[in-house]
């Protein structure tokens, strides 16, 4: 049955808006060419979207630069403002962007481990408000949060699985209270990093891959056939709890010590480096920075030491080999179950190891499994979480603003169809 005129208009409007998001400003002629719509239909939708305040003339094209065909249309970027929040054990990072995802301001603050719940929440919320003010955003339409822990698929609430600070779990509710007009949602940090790698990073050519997060702790995100897979309880990818050989005791339901976490988290990486005579300079920047320093330093020295060493592997070489041995245990487990074809070493430590560490892990996987698997190093590093949170917030805002009934409404489309506060959106569900 053919679509009704109103449905056809809505479909055409969304198609045009998506093209303007993906391609940037376009003329009516370019919209006609890209959409395949007739000239009158394009003229109608341009007028309709302009009246709704979603697009505007942003310039002219062509040598003569005059006439209706020369007008270039773009999304009204300040129609809505978005915030992305990256919550870590040691602090918070915030970025505020416009509707097309252009970052206008960003900042981060450390939060001490012994800070009370109230003071920690106040620091985090105040940072969001300050960055929004610096960005010139009078109000935030959408706030996307990335945090460690499990996100319940039914409620969208963050659940602790590894003894995280109480303020992590209370941040969504506190932000929603301080920003009552905003749509606030939370997603597991590693899932957001995978989204960023799929959209903007090294996995753009992959519909199926696994991201292995190597930062303060460990985690994994699973993307199969283009969709993120969360599992029945939202816990897909809790690889830190994977039992592994060589630890004093297996992990428990409340503590991942003794699991893969004990082999590949930043503290374990620093200890492994010290065992091989590779050490980082003393720093107050934290264990993640120390792990990044030892891995990056080893990568920088490995070529020279391989050439100079006559009596067995040099320290940097031995350290990277030992680290690759450890990472291969986790990667091989994922490969045996999922056969993803590609594993991305993500996070700050994955980026520090780069192609050198990725090649070592891939070599080991090639000897451990018959399933062909490419191992790649992230190019986004620790910034992937914030980027993924921003992409999720942008998707959610555009979903509301671009939908029929949401177009041009002063509340930005808030209504019965809007997801409830705290519900994670923006990534495909199984």
Task: State what each model feature region is.
Residues 98, 153, 223:
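Short, acidic, Ser/Thr-enriched surface-loop or helix-capping motifs
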Residues 206-264:
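Glycine-rich phosphate-binding loop of actin/hexokinase-like ATP-binding domains
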């Amino acid at each position: 049955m053919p679509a009704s005129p109103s449905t056809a208009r809505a479909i055409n409007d969304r198609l045009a808006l998506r093209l303007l998001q993906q391609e940037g400003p376009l003329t009516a002629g370019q919209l006609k060419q890209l959409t395949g719509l007739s000239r009158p239909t394009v003229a109608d939708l341009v007028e309709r979207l302009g009246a709704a305040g979603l697009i505007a003339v942003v310039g002219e094209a062509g040598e003569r630069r005059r006439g209706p065909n020369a007008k270039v249309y773009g999304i009204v970027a300040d129609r809505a403002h978005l915030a992305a929040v990256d919550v870590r054990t040691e602090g918070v990072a915030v970025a505020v962007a416009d509707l097309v995802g252009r970052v206008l301001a960003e900042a981060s603050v450390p939060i001490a481990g012994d800070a009370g719940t109230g003071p920690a929440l106040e620091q985090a919320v105040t940072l969001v408000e300050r960055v929004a003010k610096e960005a010139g955003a009078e109000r935030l339409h959408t706030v996307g949060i990335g945090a460690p822990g499990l996100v319940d698929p039914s409620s969208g609430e963050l659940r602790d699985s590894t003894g995280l600070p109480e303020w992590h779990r209370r941040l969504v509710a506190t932000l929603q209270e301080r920003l009552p007009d905003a749509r606030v949602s939370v997603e597991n940090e590693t899932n957001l990093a995978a989204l960023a790698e799929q959209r903007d990073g090294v996995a753009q050519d992959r519909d199926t891959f696994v991201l292995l997060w190597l930062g303060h702790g460990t985690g994994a995100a699973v993307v199969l056939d283009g969709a993120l897979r969360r599992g029945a309880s939202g816990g897909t990818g809790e690889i830190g709890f994977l039992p592994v050989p060589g630890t004093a005791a297996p992990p428990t339901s409340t503590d991942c010590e003794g699991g893969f976490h004990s082999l590949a988290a930043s503290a374990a990486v620093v200890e492994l480096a010290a065992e091989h005579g590779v050490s980082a300079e003393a720093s107050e920047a934290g264990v993640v920075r120390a792990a990044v320093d030892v891995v990056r330093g080893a990568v920088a020295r490995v070529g020279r030491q391989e050439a100079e060493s006559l009596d067995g592997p040099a320290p940097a070489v031995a350290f990277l080999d030992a680290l690759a041995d450890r990472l291969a245990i986790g990667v091989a487990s994922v490969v045996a179950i999922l056969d993803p074809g590609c594993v991305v070493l993500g996070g700050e430590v994955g980026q520090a190891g780069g192609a050198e560490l990725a090649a070592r892990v891939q070599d080991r996987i090639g000897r451990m499994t018959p399933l062909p698997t490419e191992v790649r190093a992230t190019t986004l590093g620790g910034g992937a979480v914030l980027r993924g949170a921003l992409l999720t917030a942008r998707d959610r805002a555009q979903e509301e603003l671009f939908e029929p009934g949401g177009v041009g409404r002063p509340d930005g489309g808030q209504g019965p169809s809007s997801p409830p506060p705290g519900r994670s959106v923006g990534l495909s569900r199984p």
